[in-house]
Each structure stands twice: as C-alpha cells, then as structure tokens.
C-alpha cells in the first residue's frame, strides 16, 4: 500500500506544479487537515477540503508563479509519506525559495493530513525516524 500512497502525493505535487487545482483538490480527503510550519504567518490548522483549498488559493494568489522542486526522494512509513522540497515563488509578491519537508497521511487514495516542517530532522522525528 505504501507505494500507492507515494504515488498519491507525487500526483499532488505534479498537479500543483501544473496549476491543476481540480486534481489537487480531488487528491485531498473531504476531512483533510493542513498544518503549516511553526511560525507560518497565517493561523491554522485548516480543517476540511474547502478550508484547505481556500488557503491554497490565497497562497497561490500571492505570486505570479510558484512551484515545488523536490530535493529528496519520497519516503514512506506505513500510511505516512514525506518529501523534502523547495517552494519557489516569483512575481508580484516577494520572491522566495522556502525549504520545507512535508509529511502526509494517505488513506484510501486521498490525503487526510498535511503537515509542513522547516526542520527536516523534526519532520523525521514526527515519522519516528532520525537522520
């Protein structure tokens, strides 16, 4: 099952980078929970697909373009999948290259939880692993 979970998250990244928010939305469970990294400017968590998609729309509207560049392989522990990436943004908002690690819980082909970490080691600890 874990390789299928990795594929769900891979498809979500591909959809985001292609601007295909319909596919991204469908890969999120109706009850998905999104938690930003510590110190993120917008309060959270966001509970439910509609709240998550409103946050996504708000984030994406901040810049003319944004994309995720993977800087690690996907790895999985049971129903959880993690990947390290750089979120590159450009345009009318401040340009940035934010390095994050995302930890995702996937059930029945949909993402039910998303949590982001600035510190990769902290993300691994959340998975019960270490660097």
Residue ranges and their predicted role:
Residues 1-131:
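C-terminal and inter-domain tail/linker signature
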């Amino acid at each position: 099952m874990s390789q299928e979970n990795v594929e769900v998250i891979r498809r979500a990244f591909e959809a985001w980078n292609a601007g295909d928010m319909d596919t991204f939305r469908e890969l999120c469970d109706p009850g998905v929970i999104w938690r930003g990294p510590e110190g993120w400017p917008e309060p959270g968590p966001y509970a439910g697909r509609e709240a998550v998609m409103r946050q996504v729309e708000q984030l994406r509207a901040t810049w003319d373009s944004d994309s995720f560049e993977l800087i690690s392989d996907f790895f999985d522990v049971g129903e959880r999948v993690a990947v390290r990436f750089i979120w590159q943004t450009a345009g009318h908002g401040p340009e940035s290259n934010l390095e994050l690690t995302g930890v995702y819980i996937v059930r029945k082909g949909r993402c039910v939880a998303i949590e982001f970490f600035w510190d990769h080691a902290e993300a691994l600890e959340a998975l019960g692993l270490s660097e």
